[in-house]
Amino acid sequence: MSNIIKYKKKILNGDLLTKEEVEELLEEGITDLAATANEIREFLCGNKFDLCTIINGKSGRCQENCKYCAQSSYFDTDIIEYNILHSDRIINSGISNYNKGVHRFSVVTSGRALNNNEVDTLCKTYSKLKEICSIRLCASHGLLKYEDLKRLKDSGVTRYHNNLETSKSFFKNICTTHTYNDKIETIKNAKKAGLEICSGGIIGLGETMEDRIDMAFTLRELSVESVPVNILNPIKGTPLENQEILSYEEIIKTLALFRFILPTVQIRLAGGRALLSDKGKKVLESGVNGAISGDMLTTLGIETSEDIKMIKNLGFEV
């Protein structure tokens, strides 16, 4: 019996793979790996697809030095800078996305964390939006304290986003102004506040496949509900502007392995999808059951109507 069949049976029986077992799958062919990951997804998660959109609620002037990010004040990019968007702009965007058939809507803000006044402002916005429509609210506001995370929860936010970005051992190569443990503490505080967790990372930063596997196992230990996987889109002016873009085969292999490691979570194809020739269709057949639609924070994405059509054609329920 091949490893891929053996480990598929183990997962479908309710057991989790060890890191050593996952590493054995690295030698498997991509076609078989992707197809089996999709079988695991269908058996354990069904065909329901989770579609979300984001809005850049505060842009630029970030004091952190994440090497991939156009919003960092350390780098000379052409990013448009602004403070917290007006409440009406956020609410109208949420309603518009709900009417398009999107399930979740997240406000994402630049910076290490919001200050008290900014949290107050956004909590009022979340409360208003919750009253108007039933789109599920997510938030991504950096390394917030427990008290602020609880306020978000009380305002109608159901899920908090904070990416690990990469493995603990590789993180220092990407950012030095905050630590991996800072991120983990924020995630734990968000869970304590009663929020679901959306946490994943970026692939193509220069990390190895082993780094990606390590990150996935850390996410499993943290019991996150959603794992967004971004493909690096190198941005001019950042230290990674000349980073080579991953091959499509490497992307498919990574997402498929994530399904073997995280058999029951929402694995979400996120930023960088517009770089792919088929807009991510093959990846969506490799164990994925979620995606971010529309534009990203500082790069263009894919129209939601186009996404929904493609997702339905693949047999998913949206």
Curated annotation (Swiss-Prot):
SUPFAM superfamilies: Radical SAM enzymes. It holds the Pfam family Radical_SAM. This is Biotin synthase. Belongs to the radical SAM superfamily. Biotin synthase family. Residues 44-273 form the Radical SAM core domain. InterPro entries: Aldolase_TIM (IPR013785), BATS_dom (IPR010722), Biotin_synth/BioAB (IPR002684), Biotin_synthase (IPR024177), Elp3/MiaA/NifB-like_rSAM (IPR006638), rSAM (IPR007197). Keywords: 2Fe-2S, 4Fe-4S, Biotin biosynthesis, Iron, Iron-sulfur, Metal-binding, S-adenosyl-L-methionine, Transferase. One of its GO terms (molecular function) is 2 iron, 2 sulfur cluster binding. Disulfide bonds: none annotated. Pathway: Cofactor biosynthesis; biotin biosynthesis; biotin from 7,8-diaminononanoate: step 2/2. Homodimer. Catalyzes the conversion of dethiobiotin (DTB) to biotin by the insertion of a sulfur atom into dethiobiotin via a radical-based mechanism. Binds 1 [4Fe-4S] cluster. The cluster is coordinated with 3 cysteines and an exchangeable S-adenosyl-L-methionine. Binds 1 [2Fe-2S] cluster. The cluster is coordinated with 3 cysteines and 1 arginine. Its cofactor is [4Fe-4S] cluster; [2Fe-2S] cluster. Its EC number is 2.8.1.6. [4Fe-4S] cluster binds at C62, C66, C69. One of its GO terms (biological process) is biotin biosynthetic process. [2Fe-2S] cluster binds at S106, C138, C198, R268. The lineage of its organism: Bacteria, Bacillati, Bacillota, Clostridia, Eubacteriales. It catalyses: (4R,5S)-dethiobiotin + (sulfur carrier)-SH + 2 reduced [2Fe-2S]-[ferredoxin] + 2 S-adenosyl-L-methionine = (sulfur carrier)-H + biotin + 2 5'-deoxyadenosine + 2 L-methionine + 2 oxidized [2Fe-2S]-[ferredoxin]. It is an enzyme of class 2 (transferase). HAMAP family: BioB.
